[in-house]
Design a protein with these regions (language model features):
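A short, charge-rich alpha-helical start-of-domain segment used by transcription regulators
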Residues: 1-24, 34-37, 48
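DNA-recognition helix of helix-turn-helix
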Residues: 73, 140-171
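Residue-level preference for hydrophobic side chains embedded in well-ordered alpha helices
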Residues: 14, 18-22, 43, 63-68, ...
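Hydrophobic positions on the alpha-helical face of helix-turn-helix-like DNA-binding modules
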Residues: 43, 67, 130-131, 143-145, ...
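Amphipathic alpha-helical segment used for protein-protein interaction
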Residues: 99-131, 136-145, 166
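Arg/Lys-rich amphipathic alpha helix in sigma70-family domain 2
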Residues: 53-55, 66-87, 101, 109, ...
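Structural recognition of an alpha-helix C-terminal capping motif at a helix-to-coil junction
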Residues: 38-45, 49, 58-70
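C-terminal edge and immediately downstream basic/flexible tail or linker adjoining helix-turn-helix-like DNA-binding
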Residues: 2-5, 9-11, 84-89, 146, ...
Length: 175
């Protein structure tokens, strides 16, 4: 198969399999609709341009997430410079959630996707990256590859982030 045809087939595979997830990723990283569309297009452009460099050392899916998150990280890096460190939530200060509580009890009836994404948006960029990949059902090993963290660090962050998000849905936090 000629190189261009192979690249087109790989890109079609990426957009078929991950197109909606890339749109969700851009929506979490950018609230402004016009900038969100630009970010999504930038992700697709980087994916297309980078396909010739894909050496199949990992799955196409893992590689796609790595490229997408690198583009988003650069996008966020620009925004972070204008945001003070006091605006971020520190997951290391979170107490573990009550393990006896059911997910329904922990989150209550006020659980909404909008609230979840608002809480995720307040996380530090690396924590946001981990939780977004987790929410897209990416395995911990692949999250570790994409983020450069160890698998253990990924598991710890996921546990702490889940506890933090659960706290955000407690009745006193919702008011």
């Amino acid at each position: 198969m000629p190189q261009r045809a192979k690249r087109e087939a790989q890109y079609r595979s990426i957009t078929d399999r991950h197109g909606a997830a890339i749109a969700r990723l851009a929506a979490v990283y950018e609230k402004d609709p016009a900038l969100r569309q630009d970010l999504e297009q930038d992700i697709h452009l980087h994916l297309w341009r980078s396909l010739d460099g894909f050496r199949e050392q990992c799955s196409l899916s893992t590689w796609t997430w790595r490229v997408a998150h690198n583009v988003c990280a650069r996008h966020v890096d620009k925004a972070v410079r204008s945001r003070s460190a006091g605006d971020w939530i520190d997951i290391d200060s979170v107490e573990p959630a009550d393990q006896r509580a059911t997910p329904e009890q922990a989150t209550g009836t006020a659980l909404t996707l909008e609230r979840l994404y608002a809480l995720i948006d307040r996380l530090r960029p690396i924590d946001r990256q981990v939780v977004l990949l987790y929410l897209e059902d990416v395995e911990a090993e692949a999250i570790a590859e994409v983020t450069g963290l160890s698998s253990g660090a990924v598991a710890t962050r996921i546990h702490r982030i889940k506890a933090l998000l659960a706290q955000g849905f407690q009745p006193e936090a919702a008011s």
